[in-house]
Every structure is written in structure tokens, then in C-alpha cells.
């Protein structure tokens, strides 16, 4: 939780969408905010209802996408919820769609509000508009100023709207030229509202001067509706069907990548990454995009724009053809229009990620360094690499152990190791002795020379046993034990000299807790795989007619019991199993 609170401090005050993730890296909630920092902070600082409390309890991390205004954030929120279907979002899971204003393509066209799950080609539409009330008010104004057909043509007499000058008379059999009104409506909905607003302000002022305050308020509401409805939207753009908007920002140490994914005219997702680089920025970006699109579906077109550095821009243009050849998709650099605005939105997010990533990781590294400094004092040695051990078993079955390595401010997964503990019923002390022996025996010196501290799971007794084992192997490495309570919660750091209560040092506690949780995760994950394989072998051993040779053949050919259940007779015949034994195996499972 403290890490999340630190991350919240770096949030921008911009409008946008925020996405909460759980420990499995699954998006569990999407929200929108006028002020990202205030909104996300409110979840963690205010008293919440039960549902919100459950959300916060499950939240492990979050990320966000900046938008230009709250209206864009609202539309983006809907797109993201439909894409990710988060468990804590309900309102938008029913395929809710936002309204559009449509001019129908008929001999006598209508102006109406329409909704689409997927927009049919060829329609004249404007939107989407997240505020239905404002959309209705705007439609009402357009009917008043630029009337089209509002009646059913089946009627043989003029409609009511014709009598109040809001219908041009199709119902009365008149020949009508709709083009001037359609052009005026189109111009208005594309944002050219200056003349109308000027007229409405004049009418509002006149009504106010005559003390017709209700009428003046009515004009005021119409003006607000027009401004709301005609606000330029970037989040939905029906001219862009299937493209990625790519932007990046960089400094001397890191590059931030931002990719906005547009599908069917809507921004449905974003991808972001901040990474350290060596060499030239442009070359790193080319390599990165090549790797990214090998794993992800390529769009019809990748759109980018002018970068912060003119030299980088020239390199990008030079490499444009190369990038197109590598990715087998079109790459365009835009300098104006909506595509440029979308690029600038992606660039804004990339720049924000870059600046705040520095703040987050500087703060994180600083806290880790403080914890390492405290450990250096405790063990009287500079600490850079820490080896952490844990084991996992179920009633003595599938007894396994694991080692993780924390090295130079990060987990070094290349040095992670797992061990199957031998023997029928080993205890924890025997398990650790075997693990340490196999991990630090002769021939492993190069791998373990840099170890500054070893942490084991247990108490002072475990610490002494581990020290004896290491001395036999010729190692003099400082040792500590991570002691937990009966709820498996970390409480103390045990050394040969003292037993430190970690709650008195929150910084050290959070650091050691992260090590403890990582080694526990790694050990339990390996234990589950081992247990599953053991159950698999046991099940096969209990089937009459499956001896050692056949069992080995089945184990080598099929990865799991699930694979056997799905297998056909032909699959078994490939390894010499006849139909009779095949049916017996299937029946036994």
C-alpha cells in the first residue's frame, strides 16, 4: 500500500482514465477523472463503501492515460471497459453506446439521434456525445434554426411542426431544397458555432434587459449545450478505423514509449513502456517496435508525428521505409489535422510517463538504498547482492526449495534456482542443509562469489544450522533469518546478535517483505508444478497394465493428465498403446 501511495504523489492533475490491476496483472477497474491525482488519491484516503474497500484491498498497481478533457476521458472509459470487462465495473458492461447526431440519406432527410454498436458505412453522423441531455438540447436548437423533415410522410396533411416553422413541408407535398440547411447543420456540428453563439448571446442579453430572466436562462442553457456538444473529440474519430498512434519521449537515460490503439474509430487501449537504453535513440526505437509488433497484431497503419528533437525527426523519416519493410505495414508522419492532435495526445502521455517514472524510481531506489544501508550496519558489510531461500511442501510430499537473488536494486531472475529435496520425510533443517549444499558446492563458486548476504526462512535454530552447512562448504557469508508469525506474516529479522522487530523500521520491513514474498511466490509456484507432476505419475502407477516402460512413454509424450484426457486412440497408438489399454486408461481417469 505504501508503494501505491508514493506512486499517487506523482500523478498529474490532468483529466484522464485510471486502471487498477490485481496481483495477477489483470485490470479489475477502469475509472475516469477530471483530476487524476485527486480522484485516485480519494480511493486511498477517504472512507469507502464495502465494494470500494474490496477494490482497494485487491488493487496491487495502477496506470493511467491522460486525455485533453473530461469528456474525452468519459468516452475513453467506455472503450476501455468494453475492451477489458473489469470485474468492478458494471455500468458499461451492457454494450452501452453513446449517441450520435445523424442526417439520414433520404429524399426528405431527417435530423435525429442514433446509436450504433458498429457504425454502418456511408452514414452522415456527428459525435459521439457522452451527454445525452446536451445532445437533445442541441438537436432542439437545430430543428428550430435549420429544420429538416420531422414528420411521417404517410400523412396526407401538414404536420404540427410545419405550422410552427420547424418542418419545411414534405408532408404538405412541397418541393424542398434541403442542401442549405444540411450544409449549415454540418458546418455547425463540425465546430463552426461563432455566428450562432453571437446571436444567442444577443438574445440572452435582450431577454435579461427586459427582465425575462427565465427566457435568458433558457438561452444560457442552450449556449452551454452547444459548447458541450461541439467540443472537439479525439478519443473517437470514425475516419481512423484500424491504426496505432505512436509517440515517444526520451532523456539521456531512458525512453518512454506510448502507443494508442484505435479500432473502429475508437481508442480502445494504450500500451506504454519506459526503459533504459544504450546507443542512439532512433535505433533503440526501431528495435523496440520490431520486437513489439512480432508479439502484437499489426494495425493497417502506424501514425506518428514531429518529435521533440529535429535530428531525431530526420532519422525517423530516413528510417520510415525501413520500418515499413520490417513491419509490413504503412507508417505515416503527420504534421497537421486530427492525426497530429492524436499524436500530440500520445506524446503528452509519453512525456508524462518519462518524467514521473524518474520520480517513482528515484524514490524507490532511494528507499532500497536506505534499507541496504541499514543491513550494512547490522551485518557490518556493504550489501549489494542478497540470496534468499524458502521451501514448500504438503505433509512431506513434493518437498521443494527455492533461491531468489536480489542484485543491484532488482531481482536477478537469471540466478533463480529450484531444488527437489531428496529423501522420504525430510524436515526443514535437513531441507535447508541439502539446498545450501547443492547451491554453494564446488563448481558453483563463480555464480556465488558476489553474494553479500544470505537470508533464510526461520528462526535462530535455522540460522545456526545454515551457518554450520556453509562453514563445511568453506563460505563465510553473513546470515540472517526472516521470522514469521503463525499467520505467515513477516515480523522479525533474526541475526546471531539480535532479534529486530521490523515494525519499528517500516522502510527495512517493506524491503525485506518484498524479498520474502518473491521467494515464497517462486517456491510455491515450483511446488505446484511438482505436486501436479507427482499426482500425474501416481495416477498412472495405479492403472493396471501400465508398467514402468509404458508409464515412462506416456510421461514423455503427454505433459499432463488433461492432455491424456483429450488424447485420441491415434495419439496413444503412436507410443504403442493398443485400444484395450487406451480404454482402460481413459476409464481410470
Swiss-Prot record:
Domain UVR span(s) in chain numbering: 194-229
Pfam families reported for this sequence: GIY-YIG (PF01541), UvrC_RNaseH (PF22920), UvrC_RNaseH_dom (PF08459)
Chief location: cytoplasm
Swiss-Prot/TrEMBL GO biological process terms: nucleotide-excision repair; SOS response
Alphabetized UniProt keyword annotations: Cytoplasm, DNA damage, DNA excision, DNA repair, Excision nuclease, SOS response
Cytoplasm is among the record's keywords: yes
SMART domains: GIYc
Residue span(s) of domain GIY-YIG: 13-90
GO molecular function term, any single one: excinuclease ABC activity
Subcellular localization, as worded in the UniProt entry: Cytoplasm
Record-level GO cellular component terms: cytoplasm; excinuclease repair complex
HAMAP family from the UniProt entry: UvrC
Assembly, per entry: Interacts with UvrB in an incision complex.
Membership in a protein family: Belongs to the UvrC family.
NCBIfam families attached to this UniProt entry: uvrC
Function in brief: The UvrABC repair system catalyzes the recognition and processing of DNA lesions. UvrC both incises the 5' and 3' sides of the lesion. The N-terminal half is responsible for the 3' incision and the C-terminal half is responsible for the 5' incision.
UniProt-recorded name of the protein: UvrABC system protein C
Amino acid at each position: 500500500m505504501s508503494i501505491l501511495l508514493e506512486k499517487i504523489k506523482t500523478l498529474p492533475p490532468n483529466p484522464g482514465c485510471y486502471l487498477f490491476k490485481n496481483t495477477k496483472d489483470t485490470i479489475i477497474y477502469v475509472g475516469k477523472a477530471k483530476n487524476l491525482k485527486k480522484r485516485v488519491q480519494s480511493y486511498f484516503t477517504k472512507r469507502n463503501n464495502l465494494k470500494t474497500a474490496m477494490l482497494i484491498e485487491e488493487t496491487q498497481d495502477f496506470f493511467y492515460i491522460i486525455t485533453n478533457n473530461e469528456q474525452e476521458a468519459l468516452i475513453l472509459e467506455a472503450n476501455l471497459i468494453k475492451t477489458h470487462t473489469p470485474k468492478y465495473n458494471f455500468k458499461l458492461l451492457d454494450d452501452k453506446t453513446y449517441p450520435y447526431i445523424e442526417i439520414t440519406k433520404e429524399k426528405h432527410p431527417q435530423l435525429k439521434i442514433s446509436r450504433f454498436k458498429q457504425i454502418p458505412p456511408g452514414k452522415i453522423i456527428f459525435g459521439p456525445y457522452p451527454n445525452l441531455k446536451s445532445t437533445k438540447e442541441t438537436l432542439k436548437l437545430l430543428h428550430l434554426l435549420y429544420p429538416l423533415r420531422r414528420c411521417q410522410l404517410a400523412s396526407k396533411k401538414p404536420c404540427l411542426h410545419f405550422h410552427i416553422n420547424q418542418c419545411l413541408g414534405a408532408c404538405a407535398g412541397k418541393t424542398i431544397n434541403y442542401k442549405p440547411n444540411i450544409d449549415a447543420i454540418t458546418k455547425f456540428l463540425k465546430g463552426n458555432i461563432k455566428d450562432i453563439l453571437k446571436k444567442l448571446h444577443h438574445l440572452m442579453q435582450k431577454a435579461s434587459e427586459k427582465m425575462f430572466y427565465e427566457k435568458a436562462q433558457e438561452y444560457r442553457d442552450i449556449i452551454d449545450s452547444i459548447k458541450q456538444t461541439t467540443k472537439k473529440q479525439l478519443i473517437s474519430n470514425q475516419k481512423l478505423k484500424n491504426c496505432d498512434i505512436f509517440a515517444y519521449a526520451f532523456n539521456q537515460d531512458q525512453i518512454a514509449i506510448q502507443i494508442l490503439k484505435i479500432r473502429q474509430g475508437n481508442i480502445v487501449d494504450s500500451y506504454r513502456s519506459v526503459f533504459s537504453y544504450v546507443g542512439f535513440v532512433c535505433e533503440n526505437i526501431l528495435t523496440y517496435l520490431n520486437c513489439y509488433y512480432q508479439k502484437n497484431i499489426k494495425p493497417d497503419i502506424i501514425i506518428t508525428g514531429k518529435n521533440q528533437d529535429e535530428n531525431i525527426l530526420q532519422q525517423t523519416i530516413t528510417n520510415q521505409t525501413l520500418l515499413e519493410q520490417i513491419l509490413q505495414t504503412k507508417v505515416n508522419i503527420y504534421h497537421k489535422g486530427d492525426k497530429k492532435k492524436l499524436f500530440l495526445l500520445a506524446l503528452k502521455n509519453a512525456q508524462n510517463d518519462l518524467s514521473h517514472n524518474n520520480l517513482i524510481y528515484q524514490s524507490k531506489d532511494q528507499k532500497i538504498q536506505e534499507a541496504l544501508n541499514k543491513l550494512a550496519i547490522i551485518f557490518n558489510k556493504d550489501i549489494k547482492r542478497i540470496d534468499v531461500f524458502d521451501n514448500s511442501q504438503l505433509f512431506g510430499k513434493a518437498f521443494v526449495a527455492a533461491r531468489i537473488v536480489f542484485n543491484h536494486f532488482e531481482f536477478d531472475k537469471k540466478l533463480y534456482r529450484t531444488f527437489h529435496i531428496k529423501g522420504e520425510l525430510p524436515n526443514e533443517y535437513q531441507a535447508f542443509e541439502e539446498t545450501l549444499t547443492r547451491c554453494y558446492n564446488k563448481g558453483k563458486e563463480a555464480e556465488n562469489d558476489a553474494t553479500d548476504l544470505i537470508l533464510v526462512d526461520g528462526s535462530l535454530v535455522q540460522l545456526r544450522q545454515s551457518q554450520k552447512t556453509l562453514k563445511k562448504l568453506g563460505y563465510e557469508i553473513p546470515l540472517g533469518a526472516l521470522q514469521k508469525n503463525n499467520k505467515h506474516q513477516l515480523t522479525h529479522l533474526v541475526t546471531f546478535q539480535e532479534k529486530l522487530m521490523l515494525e519499528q523500521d517500516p522502510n527495512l520491513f517493506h524491503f525485506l517483505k518484498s524479498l520474502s514474498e518473491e521467494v515464497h511466490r517462486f517456491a510455491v509456484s515450483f511446488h505446484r508444478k511438482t505436486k501436479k507432476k507427482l499426482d500425474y505419475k501416481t495416477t498412472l502407477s495405479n492403472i493396471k497394465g501400465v508398467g514402468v516402460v509404458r508409464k515412462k512413454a506416456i510421461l514423455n509424450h503427454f505433459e499432463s493428465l488433461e492432455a491424456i484426457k483429450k488424447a485420441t486412440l491415434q495419439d496413444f497408438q503412436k507410443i504403442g498403446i493398443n485400444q484395450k489399454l487406451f480404454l482402460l486408461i481413459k476409464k481410470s481417469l
